[in-house]
């Protein structure tokens, strides 16, 4: 993190820090925005970690960019509704957001333990309170074939290609969502 900040300062580069999942990780490092507030656009949201329907988030940025960011925000027309903003602010102020976050962390922690037990002996990546598990797929499968086979067996997974930035060489895999409970 410190090295990234040094490089950004040396080359006068701005940093965009997406911490939408961060609140679910109690031991995460301090945000880069804390190390380099003069060049970091930091955003987080209540949507990912508190409640999906609560489409409300926060953006902090260097003061010099506030006007430009506000103008672009209005142009893109991505705005929280007044009701969602009011609910989000009240929940933060009265402690409801913190209680819901703790509940979510507990529920996801249990689901991650179940996933680890089921996937025992299979290499996978996850975070203790994370909402997703990354599962590399065996070389004999394509992502599409694996996804189709999983769905035929009642398991919904997303192909890694849905999250790739390019078609460059990458590890084939699927993302398993632990955030939605099925009945």
Regions found by a protein language model. Give the residues of each.
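Short, intrinsically disordered, charge-balanced linker/junction segments flanking boundaries
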Residues: 2, 114-119, 178-183
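Conserved core segment of the aminotransferase class I/II
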Residues: 41-106
């Amino acid at each position: 993190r410190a090295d990234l900040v040094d490089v950004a300062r040396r080359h006068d580069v701005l940093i965009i820090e997406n911490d939408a999942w961060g609140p679910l990780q109690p031991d995460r490092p301090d945000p880069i925005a804390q190390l380099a507030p003069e060049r970091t656009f930091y955003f987080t949201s209540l949507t990912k970690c508190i409640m999906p329907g609560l489409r409300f988030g926060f953006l902090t940025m260097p003061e010099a960019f506030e006007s430009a960011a506000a103008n672009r925000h209005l142009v893109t027309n991505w705005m929280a509704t007044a009701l969602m903003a009011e609910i989000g602010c009240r929940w933060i102020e009265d402690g409801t957001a913190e209680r819901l976050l703790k509940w979510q962390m507990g529920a996801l922690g249990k689901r991650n333990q179940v996933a680890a037990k089921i996937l025992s002996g299979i290499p996978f990546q996850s975070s203790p309170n994370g909402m997703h598990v990354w599962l590399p797929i065996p070389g004999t499968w394509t992502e599409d074939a694996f996804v189709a086979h999983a769905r035929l067996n009642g398991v919904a997974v997303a192909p890694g290609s849905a999250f790739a930035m390019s078609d460059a060489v990458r590890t084939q895999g699927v993302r398993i969502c632990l955030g939605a409970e099925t009945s």
